[in-house]
């Protein structure tokens, strides 16, 4: 049951609030809540409560002085200009008319008035103190406040904890300190505590670092108190500061000023909170240095490690190779050229010495693709002994510090510049199951480099550097000297729910402006508690056993949100797509067909989720898959086709599953969940949904319903996109995915729950708007309100807790149809016929226009077809001519082929005949040569025998002559005749006979040799004749270009030549 809320308005007069905006502030007070109990002193130790000075005013001032860490400022306070009113109307005129108003006295009035004691941020005294607020800071100053003290808290964003601290401090503080509070009007300003007597600044808290702001409940002793929490000393200690207002109504105005500060940003772009705008001649150069750590993902790539949003630390895995990526970008002053990086260093711990830094291996350096920054990449081996501290698993309750440094050579600077980054890290087990989030995975630090220009006489030549380094300071070092506080404010408001006014999230750097939130915004983390994953794993195991029955605990788990890693599978099971193979096959056929709405699809996909990396690239994989799904559905559903907005739902499904499965789930949502009914019959069912929503508003939010009636704001003006796109078009993705979880589980009626939740949480803002302002709020401010994931979770919890019965919705549906019937019956028939006639005339004109377009298209098509036909006929004639020529060439080629085949056969026959003849001649010559050789060998043997016999006979004769005394004298010792004349007569006769015999034998041998030579000459002549015939045949073969025959003749010639040589 929703709690009732009382609404009170504070009207601001021009006499008391001349410096305030001309807006009425709506204060929604919570009733029925339990008042925080007052604790005794025993609770101090548990909560870290510290009553400043135990009630001593001197001790209280001393404690506040310790909080202040800024050095004294010499700036003199100037006259503070009045604030411009945001609204128009009589109040604005009154403000301008009474522009000269005396400042409110700093001394407390003896009798409190009901008007708010607000004064311009201007000192009363002409002599300003060292701690006077900055003169150019636009702020609102509140008097008559009492500072009750501060306490340390562990849950800085907890409203219950803050109210408890407020109750304890108010009850236990005996002596308090009167202060003046200065609240800036922009988020770049600073909340300041001033001494009401001397206007001296006691403490300051930058507005962008305040975490939480809360006021006491009406009807309790703390109703005149408010408090805010801030992170003390660089977010390591959280404190709550409690104040009491002498006039209770001022609490609402103070909280409203805090909310205004967070809604507005300064129009100029200051480099820092206190620095003056710099000119190109300034000696301070600002650099933005970001650090990103990447780890080996085991697939050959390096992926950025996640960053814990709560602890602001990197999550590293033990023993995994890493890369350090540093990006340096100059953001202010004249551009300095970075020449190179000559060192990337790393060391565990913080505030380390230069000697403790260890050099990393540089992989690459150079300008980024857009040329705006300089990127350095280095490899980091965590297994090195130097980095053992950051390679051991870190306990869950601890974090480690790591220092990274990069040394850069800047062309215009005389010496190298070192940028030093200190970050927190946690080391996990290498096997730990981590779901990497898509959130920001880098840390960024701003550095302020002060340079001094070198005088001309000090430079050696014109090529020397122009500057020398005076100092280099980071933004963190600047803030360490100040009292720090932390980034976002949430103002609790009472009512049917506890809604908070969020400030910009910590990781959102874009300013609040009038530009709507881009669709596809929001990083969805895949991290999930192990216990939740185990619960879902058990549920899915049971569900797969019987897919037709949903498990009992499914609804409660879905209300808490399906884990991102399991959404693809769970959505298909919820939609009943576990057995839809026919849709998958049909999808593959549908994408090959043409869609009549192709142009509309192409136009819409370029506007779908431009803030998401998967869909932002024109012609990329994401847009291509999205185009296929929308095209396939437009062909599948011929009655409805493609309607504007379907691409957003298809894109959400495509982020969790492949194309085929996404198409199947889209078909199920359109048909089984009834989404396509909204597009039918001229959106008749959609108008019924609008009527149901307005009736629910009338029942649940009657004041907002009446306000919308007063400003003539109808449901179709702001809720059309909610129903047609299922909230997928404008809201962050983590919220969209949760809505789809609920829709697939509980049906399309979930839209009413979410719509009522949005209207409830925005009721207070909508009640202050007019028609134009309400439309702008729905278009711009409402989606931006849920850039914080915590706000989105609270909205979904509220939506799930809102009970809307189906019986009630059917009742409203019957009322709508009855109302439509009554309108039709009460309507004048003539007016109805005239309206129908106008509709038919418009339809007729549209059809005539379409007919003209089709006729024009037909004529154009006929002309194009005639031209194509003429070209085809010309091409056919040319091809026919080419065909006839080719046929004639084919006939000639066949005749030539036959002729050559006949000649080839004749040549083969002649070659075979000549070859046989040559072989016979060769055999004959071989036999003759063999016989000749045999005769020669016989004659040689015969000659040798005769010579041997002659030698034997001569030896015998010599022996006989030696034995004869008379003949011995005729021969000498060598056997030669001494005297020829004496022996001539005796042996002439024998010698002549022997010579004659030998001559006869020699003549016979010469005769045989002559005959053999003659036969050899005849054989050579025949061989020459054969070679001549072969030469003629060879010339004919060359003429016929038959290489195979040429090779045959060459082989025959070669063989014949070899045999002829052997014959010789």
Curated annotation (Swiss-Prot):
A Pfam match: RabGAP-TBC
Disordered as annotated region, ranges: 1-101, 478-520
CDD domains assigned: PTB_Rab6GAP
Sites annotated Arginine finger: 603
PANTHER family (UniProt xref): RAB GTPASE-ACTIVATING PROTEIN 1 (PTHR47219:SF6), RAB GTPASE-ACTIVATING PROTEIN 1-LIKE (PTHR47219)
Extent of Low complexity compositional bias: 7-22
Coiled coil: 805-1038
Protein known as: Rab GTPase-activating protein 1
Location of the PID domain: 137-293
Organism: Mus musculus (Mouse)
Site (Glutamine finger): 644
Chief localisation class: cytoplasm
């Amino acid at each position: 049951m929703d709690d009732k809320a009382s609404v009170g308005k504070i009207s601001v007069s021009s006499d008391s609030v001349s410096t305030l905006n001309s807006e009425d502030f709506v204060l929604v007070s919570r009733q029925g809540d339990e008042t925080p109990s007052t604790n005794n002193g025993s609770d101090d130790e548990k909560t870290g409560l510290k009553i400043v000075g135990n009630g001593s005013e001197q001790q209280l001032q001393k404690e506040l002085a310790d909080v202040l860490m800024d050095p004294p400022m010499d700036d003199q306070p100037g006259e503070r200009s009045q604030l411009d009113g945001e609204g128009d109307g009589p109040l604005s005129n009154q403000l301008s008319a009474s522009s000269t108003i005396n400042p409110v006295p700093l001394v407390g009035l003896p009798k409190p008035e009901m008007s708010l004691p607000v004064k311009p941020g201007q000192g009363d005294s002409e002599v300003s103190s060292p701690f006077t607020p900055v003169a150019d800071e636009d702020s609102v100053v509140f008097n008559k406040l009492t500072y009750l003290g501060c306490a340390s808290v562990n849950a800085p964003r907890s409203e219950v904890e803050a109210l408890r601290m407020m109750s304890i401090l108010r009850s236990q503080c005996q002596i308090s300190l009167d202060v003046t509070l200065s609240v800036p009007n922009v988020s770049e300003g600073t909340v300041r505590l001033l001494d009401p007597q001397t206007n001296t600044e006691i403490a300051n808290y930058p507005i962008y670092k305040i975490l939480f702001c809360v006021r006491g409940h009406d009807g309790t002793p703390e109703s005149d108190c408010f408090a805010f929490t801030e992170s003390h000393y660089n977010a390591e200690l959280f404190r709550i500061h409690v104040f009491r207002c002498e006039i209770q109504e001022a609490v609402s105005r103070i909280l409203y000023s805090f909310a205004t500060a967070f809604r507005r940003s300064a129009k100029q772009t200051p480099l820092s909170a206190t620095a003056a705008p710099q000119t190109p001649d300034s000696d301070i150069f600002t650099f933005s240095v970001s650090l990103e750590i990447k780890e080996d993902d085991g697939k050959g790539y390096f992926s950025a490690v996640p960053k814990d949003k709560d602890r602001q630390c990197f999550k590293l895995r033990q023993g995994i190779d890493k890369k350090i990526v540093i990006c340096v970008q100059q953001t202010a002053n004249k551009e300095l050229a970075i020449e190179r990086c000559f060192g990337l260093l790393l060391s565990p711990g913080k505030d380390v010495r230069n000697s403790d830094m260890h050099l990393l291996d540089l992989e690459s350096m150079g300008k980024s693709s857009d040329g705006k920054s300089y990127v350095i990449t280095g490899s980091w081996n965590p297994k090195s002994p130097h980095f053992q501290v950051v390679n051991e698993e870190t306990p869950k309750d601890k974090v480690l510090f790591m220092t990274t440094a990069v040394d850069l050579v800047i062309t215009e600077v005389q010496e190298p510049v070192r940028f030093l980054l200190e970050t927190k890290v946690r080391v996990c087990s290498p096997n730990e199951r981590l779901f990497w989030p898509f959130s920001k995975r880098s840390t960024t630090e701003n550095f302020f480099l002060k340079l001094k220009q070198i005088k001309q006489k000090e430079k050696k030549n014109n090529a020397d550097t122009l500057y020398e380094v005076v100092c280099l300071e980071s933004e963190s070092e600047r803030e360490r000297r100040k009292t720090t506080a932390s980034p976002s404010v949430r103002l609790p408001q009472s009512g049917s729910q506890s809604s908070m006014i969020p400030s910009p999230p910590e990781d959102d750097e874009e300013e609040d402006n009038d530009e709507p939130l881009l669709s596809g915004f929001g990083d969805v983390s895949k991290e999930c508690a192990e216990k939740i994953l185990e619960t879902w794993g058990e549920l899915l195991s049971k569900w797969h056993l019987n897919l037709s029955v949903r498990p009992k605990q499914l609804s409660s788990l879905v209300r808490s949100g399906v884990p991102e890693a399991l959404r693809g599978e769970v959505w298909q099971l919820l939609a009943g797509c576990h057995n839809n193979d026919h849709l998958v096959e049909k999808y593959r056929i549908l994408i090959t067909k043409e869609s009549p709405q192709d142009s509309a699809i192409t136009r819409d996909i370029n506007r779908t989720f431009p803030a998401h990396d998967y869909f932002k690239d024109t012609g990329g994989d994401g847009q291509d898959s999205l185009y296929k799904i929308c095209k396939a559905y437009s062909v599948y559903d011929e009655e409805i086709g493609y309607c504007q907005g379907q691409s957003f739902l298809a894109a959400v499904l495509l982020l969790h599953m492949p194309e085929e499965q996404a198409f199947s789930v889209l078909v199920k949502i359109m048909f089984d969940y009834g989404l396509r009914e909204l597009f039918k019959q001229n959106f008749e069912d959609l108008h019924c949904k609008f009527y149901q929503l307005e009736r629910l508003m009338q029942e649940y939010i009657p004041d907002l319903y009446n306000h919308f009636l007063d400003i003539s704001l109808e449901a179709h003006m702001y809720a059309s996109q909610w129903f047609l796109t299922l909230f997928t078009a404008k809201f962050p993705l983590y919220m969209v995915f949760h809505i789809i979880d609920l829709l697939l589980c509980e049906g399309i009626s979930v839209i009413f729950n979410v719509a009522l939740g949005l209207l409830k949480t925005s009721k207070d803002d909508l009640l202050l708007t007019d028609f134009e302002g309400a439309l702008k709020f729905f278009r711009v401010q409402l989606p931006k309100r849920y850039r914080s994931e915590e706000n989105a979770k609270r909205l979904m919890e509220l939506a799930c807790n809102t009970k809307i019965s189906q019986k009630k919705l059917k009742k409203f549906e019957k009322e709508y149809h009855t109302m439509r019937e009554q309108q039709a019956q009460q309507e004048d028939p003539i007016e109805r016929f005239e309206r129908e006639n106008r509709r038919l005339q418009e339809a007729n004109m549209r059809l005539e226009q379409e007919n003209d377009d089709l006729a024009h298209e037909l004529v154009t098509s006929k002309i194009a077809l005639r031209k194509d036909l003429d070209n085809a006929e010309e091409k056919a004639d040319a091809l026919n001519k080419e065909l006839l020529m080719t046929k004639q060439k084919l006939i000639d080629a066949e005749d030539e082929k036959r002729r050559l085949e006949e000649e080839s056969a004749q040549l083969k026959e002649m070659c075979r005949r000549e070859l046989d003849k040559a072989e016979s001649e060769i055999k004959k010559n071989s036999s003759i040569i063999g016989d000749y050789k045999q005769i020669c060998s016989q004659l040689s043997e015969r000659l040798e025998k005769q010579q041997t016999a002659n030698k034997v006979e001569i030896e015998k004769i010599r022996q006989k002559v030696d034995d004869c005394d008379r003949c011995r004298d005729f021969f000498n010792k060598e056997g030669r005749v001494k005297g020829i004349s004496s022996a001539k007569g005796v042996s002439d006769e024998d010698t002549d006979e022997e010579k004659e015999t030998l001559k006869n034998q020699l003549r016979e041998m010469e005769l045989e040799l002559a005959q053999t030579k003659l036969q050899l000459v005849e054989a050579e002549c025949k061989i020459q004749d054969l070679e001549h015939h072969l030469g003629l045949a060879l010339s004919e073969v060359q003429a016929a270009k038959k290489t195979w025959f040429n090779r045959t003749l060459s082989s025959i010639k070669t063989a014949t030549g070899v045999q002829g040589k052997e014959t010789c």
